[in-house]
Amino acid sequence: MKSKARAVVIGGGVVGVSTLYHLAAKGWDDSILLERKSLTSGSTWHAAGLLPLFNMSYSVGQIHKYSVRFYQELQDETGMDVGFRKVSNIRLASTQDRMDEYLQYKGVADTIGVEVNVLSPQEIKDCWPLVSTENLIGAIQHPEDGYIQPADLTQAFAKGARDKGAKIEINTNVISIKRSPNDTWIVETDKGHIECEHVISCSGNFARKTGKMVGLDLPVIPVEHQYIVTEQHPLIKERKDKNLPELGVLRDSDASWYMREE
């Protein structure tokens, strides 16, 4: 393992490996990523992989727009399938307040250049035949949205980062992070230490532990969610047998759930 680097990224999930890739793409090829186990072994392996273009912030919306475009470009660059499926994303509104929020967002989306369609209950039914529209006011739909496979995306990022000169060390546990007298960082691991200019924590569930190494108390805790996989519905099987398009990602913010085809 190298003993000096411009930047050390801690955490081998999709966020960490994406960070390493983009550093290398900007010319910071003297960067290294440290992962305590294997890539995607934290939260990434079971993430839903949704690509929500929806965001009320103009700047964050630009990042989302970039990401959806970039994932397709990454496939071409690395030759690795990231599981990108442009199936659209439909957000349901069962209250007028929620529908007003979506209509306000459409103004932001139009400014960013993100395509958004406003759907009536009947149009929702046309897109998603299994949806009960009885209590719905409407919805918005992002035709360019969809989902990716997070583990596949991470491996594509890793290949792209390595191709650009960056290094990845798996099965490497970070023990401490300290400031040196010459104002660099010393990252101590169970395989030795690395001196670097910058440390980027992308440690997910371990963010609080990593923060304490530099004297920060990060109010971050893991939250358990429910993940349900159902048997295949006859209508969905029929659609697949007929080679019809995959149904879009469906979201209900008021009921706090989302779903997509597996």
Named regions from a protein language model:
Residues G11-G16, K191, C202-G204:
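Conserved phosphate-binding and hydrolysis motifs of nucleotide-dependent enzymes
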Residues A24-W45:
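Glycine-rich FAD pyrophosphate-binding loop
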Residues V17, Q155, R208:
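Residues forming the Rossmann-fold NAD(P)(H) cofactor-binding site
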Residues G49-C127, L247, D254-M259:
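Dinucleotide-binding Rossmann-like beta1-alpha1 core, especially the glycine-rich loop
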Residues K4-A5, T189, C196-E197:
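Active-site acidic short loop of glycosyltransferases
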Residues M1-V15, I32:
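Beta1/beta-strand and adjacent pyrophosphate-binding region of the FAD-binding site
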